[in-house]
Amino acid sequence: MGNHAGKRELNAEKASTNSETNRGESEKKRNLGELSRTTSEDNEVFGEADANQNNGTSSQDTAVTDSKRTADPKNAWQDAHPADPGSRPHLIRLFSRDAPGREDNTFKDRPSESDELQTIQEDSAATSESLDVMASQKRPSQRHGSKYLATASTMDHARHGFLPRHRDTGILDSIGRFFGGDRGAPKRGSGKDSHHPARTAHYGSLPQKSHGRTQDENPVVHFFKNIVTPRTPPPSQGKGRGLSLSRFSWGAEGQRPGFGYGGRASDYKSAHKGFKGVDAQGTLSKIFKLGGRDSRSGSPMARR
C-alpha cells in the first residue's frame, strides 16, 4: 500500500511539472503568434489566419521537439512565412484580388470580378428588360434573359413543353375523333340487320364499368393503350367498322367470317347481360369474365 501511495504522489508531481511545462510552451506559442502578426502587418489577409490555423501545428512541433528554434522565434517562422510572396504565390493571387476591405495593388491592370459583372449588367440592361418579360411568361424557372437568348431553340421549347403541347393537342384531337366521333359513323351507315338500333341503345345504356373500354374515356388513354399493345389492328379503319366493334368482335372473326354486324352485336349484348350464351359465344364470355371489367388490364388486344 505504501508503494502505491508513493507512486501516486510521484504521478501527481509529474503531472504538475508537465502542466507547468505546457503552460510555458503555450506562452511561447502566444509570443510567437504575436511576433508573426507584427511582422506580417503588410499582408493582413494572411497574418491572422496563418498564425492561428494553418501553421499552428507546425509551430507546436518546432516548439516541442527543437529547442534551438523556439529560442529564436524568427527561425520558427521562416519555413512557411505568411507574408512571403515567393513561397505561396497562388494563395496571394487567391486572397489579394477581391478580398473584402482591401485595396488591390497586385492586379491593377485587370478589373475585379465585381466590376466585370456590373459592366455586363449595364450593357445588357436595355435588351434584358424585354427578355425578362418573355422569360417570366414562358420560362419561370429561368433567371437571366441572356441565357434564354442563348438557348432559344425548338429543342429548348420542347424541353419546357410549349410547342409539343399545341402539336399534341392536334394529334390527340384527331385520335379522339377517330375513337369517339367516327365510331358512330359505321353504326349509323350500315343498316344491314335488325340488331342495329338495339345495339346503339345498348351502348348508351351500358354502365361504363361493365365493358372493357368506356365510351367517354379520355382519348389519350386510348392512344397509349393501343400503342402499348403490340398487335393494334390499323386495318380496322379500312374495313369500314369502328374500332370498338373490332375490339369486341375479334374472338369470333376467324370462326364465323360470314356474319355481319348483327351476330357480333348479339354476342356483345349476351356477353354483358350475364354471359348466358355459352354455345357460340364461349370465347367472348371467357374474355369478358377475365378482364372485361377493368378498362386498363382487361383489353382483349393485350390477350390476343
Swiss-Prot record:
PTM annotation, UniProt: Several charge isomers of MBP; C1 (the most cationic, least modified, and most abundant form), C2, C3, C4, C5, C6, C7, C8-A and C8-B (the least cationic form); are produced as a result of optional PTM, such as phosphorylation, deamidation of glutamine or asparagine, arginine citrullination and methylation. C8-A and C8-B contain each two mass isoforms termed C8-A(H), C8-A(L), C8-B(H) and C8-B(L), (H) standing for higher and (L) for lower molecular weight. C3, C4 and C5 are phosphorylated. The ratio of methylated arginine residues decreases during aging, making the protein more cationic. The N-terminal alanine is acetylated (isoform 3, isoform 4, isoform 5 and isoform 6).
Membrane topology term: Peripheral membrane protein
Residues annotated with Phosphoserine modification: 96, 141, 146, 153, 174, 190, 210, 249, 295, 299
Coiled-coil zones: none
Modification Citrulline occurs at: 159, 165, 167, 199, 231, 256, 264, 293, 296, 303-304
PTM-bearing positions, type Phosphothreonine: 151, 154, 169, 214, 229, 232
Phosphotyrosine, modified sites: 148, 203
Record-listed Deamidated glutamine modification sites: 237, 281
Record-linked Pfam families: Myelin_MBP (PF01669)
GO biological process: axon ensheathment; central nervous system development; chemical synaptic transmission; immune response; maintenance of blood-brain barrier; MAPK cascade; membrane organization; myelination
CC per GO annotation: cell periphery; cell surface; compact myelin; cytosol; internode region of axon; myelin sheath; neuronal cell body; nucleus
PTM annotation (Omega-N-methylarginine): residues: 177, 183, 241
Positions carrying Symmetric dimethylarginine: 241
Disordered as annotated region, ranges: 1-146, 180-249
Spans annotated as Induces experimental autoimmune encephalomyelitis (EAE) 1: 179-222
Biased composition (Polar residues): 51-65, 117-130
Record site feature (Cleavage), residues: 224-225, 248-249
UniProt keywords, alphabetically: Acetylation, Autoimmune encephalomyelitis, Cell membrane, Citrullination, Membrane, Methylation, Nucleus, Phosphoprotein
Entry's Gene Ontology molecular function annotations: calmodulin binding; lipid binding; protease binding; structural constituent of myelin sheath
PANTHER family: MYELIN BASIC PROTEIN
Family: Belongs to the myelin basic protein family.
Function noted in UniProt: The classic group of MBP isoforms (isoform 4-isoform 14) are with PLP the most abundant protein components of the myelin membrane in the CNS. They have a role in both its formation and stabilization. The smaller isoforms might have an important role in remyelination of denuded axons in multiple sclerosis. The non-classic group of MBP isoforms (isoform 1-isoform 3/Golli-MBPs) may preferentially have a role in the early developing brain long before myelination, maybe as components of transcriptional complexes, and may also be involved in signaling pathways in T-cells and neural cells.
Disorder association: The reduction in the surface charge of citrullinated and/or methylated MBP could result in a weakened attachment to the myelin membrane. This mechanism could be operative in demyelinating diseases such as chronical multiple sclerosis (MS), and fulminating MS (Marburg disease).
Name this protein carries in UniProt: Myelin basic protein
Organism: Homo sapiens
Record gene name: MBP
